[in-house]
Every structure is written in structure tokens, then in C-alpha cells.
């Protein structure tokens, strides 16, 4: 198992299943060992990591610095530090599971760690690599123009009625989107085919995967592509928008409803109203603070630790931690309608990224 082999790289805390039997004892042991170690630096693509690192430092009396950094920059930093033998990054939270697996785990530049005491609350699918949160991306509509979502099936987005009226980030510049395509093909193709038959009354009449057929048809329907979630959300639900669009955005954009936006989630969309994408927590091989790094990952897996990101609709991988009632999108009550990413097949996503990008590029029409 990859996590166990890499755990031996830099472990100073003796661990066994019994070591995690008591919450307080396990955490006290980690904390005691961490007090003998240097301060840690943690990189994440969300600015909330700064707040989380400060709260961690205050709670445990340790020094941790949070740095906002996009996944490609963090990956490059860890790789260069490992190659130079000069480790400055201790923990990385990466919203790019395939790259994390291929460029850091499989090279030994970072390693996976999972706290055994959480085995009853974190599904096996989220343990190796360790997924801290799942970020929902949802199909949205303008609640000022429609009482309910104007579509009921994802295949409707490929039809003439919605030509140039679907908006989303450009998959050629957003790797998570093509990873989503590959995940659907690997784990959700039967559901995509069933949705096609439910909508049109007959099976899909070709031998290719239903997912690839949908991707090609969506690309050919001239969607409005943007370079950010914000632009996609504005196209759907800005205060002055008079045209009806369906958009794919993160749940974080629902914060803007407080400032006049009118985003709504397409509930009960067949087969899914959206999908999730993980943030993977890894420890840099060669860190001088392995115990503090583990304690920080554990902290992010607590309700207190993940609270700042939960406000944006990011869902803890712990089954016993719910989103706060104040989260603006309401996605917590709709989790069962999301297509859930499988981190265990992230390498397959990495290997097929170019193929899905090529498929999109060849079929896209403006």
C-alpha cells in the first residue's frame, strides 16, 4: 500500500492500530513530538489556509504558516525542493489529485498519511491519497428568471434550445474538468447512458461511451467558455442578466447571492446536479517536522479545522461533519445528487487528460 511504504520515510511517532485507539492519547503523542520540531509551512490554493494555519498555531501552541498558492506552483516548488535537497514546504493541500499522485506520490517527493482513528468516519476511497475536502461544482440557473431549473436532464444541454446558452470554464485551461470527464467515463458511464435513454426514449445508438458522446455534443453546442468561475456565475445570474443561461460553477460563488446575484442549483438533474473534486493532503518527504505536519492534516479533518472552507460549500470527507447551516448554496442537503470523484483512480485521469482535451478541442464550436 502506497501510504504505508511512504510513511516510513519520515516517521518519528511510533504508530500501531492501538496507538490511535484513544483520541486524546494519540493527539497528545503527536503534539508532544511536534513541539520538538521546527515551524511548518503549508500551501493550499485557497486563501482560507492562512486563517486555518493561524487557528492551528493558536490551538496547539505551534508555529504554522499558511500560503495561498495555485496547485501547479505548489507542485513545482515541492519537486524543485526535493531535487535540491532543500525542503521548505512541509504540507501541501492540492486541488489536483492526478498531478499529486503522478508527480509527488509516485516519485517519492511526498507521502500519504492517514490517521487510523478516523477509519470509521472516512470512507476507504478517501484515504490513499488522503482527500481532505470535496469541492462541489454544480449546474446553476437564474432564480430571477425561473422558478425552478429549466432543464431536468444533462443531455438537454446538448440540444439547440441551449446553443450558446451554457457557460462554464474552458476545459482546456481547467484540468479538473477533463478529469471529471474521465471519472464519468470510468465510474458513471452507465448512469450517463441511462439518462440519455430516459430523455430520448431509446438507447444511445453508437458503440462509444455515453460520456464521450455527451462531451462531444456539449462542445459542439457552442458553450460560452470563461477563464473563471466568477465569469461563469455572472453570465448566469448577474443582477442585470435578462437571458437564460445554465452554468457550471463552484458552490463558493453562491456567496455572491448576498450582493445581488441570483444563483440557484439545478436540483434533481438527471443523472447528477454536479460533481465533486478533491483537495489532497500530502507531507513533503524529508520535512524536518513530520509530526507537526501530521497534526496539521489531522486538524484539517476536524470540524473546527475545516470550518473556514466549509463556509464555501467544501464538504469534509468525514461522514460525521456536516456543512454549516449558514453555507449559502444549500449543497449539504443535496450531496446524494453529486457525482463523487474517486481519488484512487486519479492516475488514470492523469494518463487520459490529453485525450479528453483533444476530444473537446476537435468538437468545440463557437
Residue ranges of model-derived segments:
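A ligand-binding cleft/hinge motif common to bilobed small-molecule-binding domains
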Residues: 98-103, 237, 242-264
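Periplasmic-binding protein-like
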Residues: 121, 134-137, 209-218, 260-285
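Mature extracytoplasmic/periplasmic domains
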Residues: 275, 279-344
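Short, polar/charged alpha-helical segment
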Residues: 26-35, 43-63
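Conserved C-terminal helix/tail region of periplasmic/extracytoplasmic solute-binding proteins
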Residues: 23, 340-366
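Extracytoplasmic ligand-binding site segments that recognize negatively charged/polar headgroups
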Residues: 43-54, 67-79, 87-237
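Bacterial N-terminal signal peptides
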Residues: 6-16
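Paired acidic/hydrophobic, glycine-rich loop segments that form the ligand-binding mouth/hinge
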Residues: 42, 85-94, 225, 242-250, ...
Amino acid at each position: 500500500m502506497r501510504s504505508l511504504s511512504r510513511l516510513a520515510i519520515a516517521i518519528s511517532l511510533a504508530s500501531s492500530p492501538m496507538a490511535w485507539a484513544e483520541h486524546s492519547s494519540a493527539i497528545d503523542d503527536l503534539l508532544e513530538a511536534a513541539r520538538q520540531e521546527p515551524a511548518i509551512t503549508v500551501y493550499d490554493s485557497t486563501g482560507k489556509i492562512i486563517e486555518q494555519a493561524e487557528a492551528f498555531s493558536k490551538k496547539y501552541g505551534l508555529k504554522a504558516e499558511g500560503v495561498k498558492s495555485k496547485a501547479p506552483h505548489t507542485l513545482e516548488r515541492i519537486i524543485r525542493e526535493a531535487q535540491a535537497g532543500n525542503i521548505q514546504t512541509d504540507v501541501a493541500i492540492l486541488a489536483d489529485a492526478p498531478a499529486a499522485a503522478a508527480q509527488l506520490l509516485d516519485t517519492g517527493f511526498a507521502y500519504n498519511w492517514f490517521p487510523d482513528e478516523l477509519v470509521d468516519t472516512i470512507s476507504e476511497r478517501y484515504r490513499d491519497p488522503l482527500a481532505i475536502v470535496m469541492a462541489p461544482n454544480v449546474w446553476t440557473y437564474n432564480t430571477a428568471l425561473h422558478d425552478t431549473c429549466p432543464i431536468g436532464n444533462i443531455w438537454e444541454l446538448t440540444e439547440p434550445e441551449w446553443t450558446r446558452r451554457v457557460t462554464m470554464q474552458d476545459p482546456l485551461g481547467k484540468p479538473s474538468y477533463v478529469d471529471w470527464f474521465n471519472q464519468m467515463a470510468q465510474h458513471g458511464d452507465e448512469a450517463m447512458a441511462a439518462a440519455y435513454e430516459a430523455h430520448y426514449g431509446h438507447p444511445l445508438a453508437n458503440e462509444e461511451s455515453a460520456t464521450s458522446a455527451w462531451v462531444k455534443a456539449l462542445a459542439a453546442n457552442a458553450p460560452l467558455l470563461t477563464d473563471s468561475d466568477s465569469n461563469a456565475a455572472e453570465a448566469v445570474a448577474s443582477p442585470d442578466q435578462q437571458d437564460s443561461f445554465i452554468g457550471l460553477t463552484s458552490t463558493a460563488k453562491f456567496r455572491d447571492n448576498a450582493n445581488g446575484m441570483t444563483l440557484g442549483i439545478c436540483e434533481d438533474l438527471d443523472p447528477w446536479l454536479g460533481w465533486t473534486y478533491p483537495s489532497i493532503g500530502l507531507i513533503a518527504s524529508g520535512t524536518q517536522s513530520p509530526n507537526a505536519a501530521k497534526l496539521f492534516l489531522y486538524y484539517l479533518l476536524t470540524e473546527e479545522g475545516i470550518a473556514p472552507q466549509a463556509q464555501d460549500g467544501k464538504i469534509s470527507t468525514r461522514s460525521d461533519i456536516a456543512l454549516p447551516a449558514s453555507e449559502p448554496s444549500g449543497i449539504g442537503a443535496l450531496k446524494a445528487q453529486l457525482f463523487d470523484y474517486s481519488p484512487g483512480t486519479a492516475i488514470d485521469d492523469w494518463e487520459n487528460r490529453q485525450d479528453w482535451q483533444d476530444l473537446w478541442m476537435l468538437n468545440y464550436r463557437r
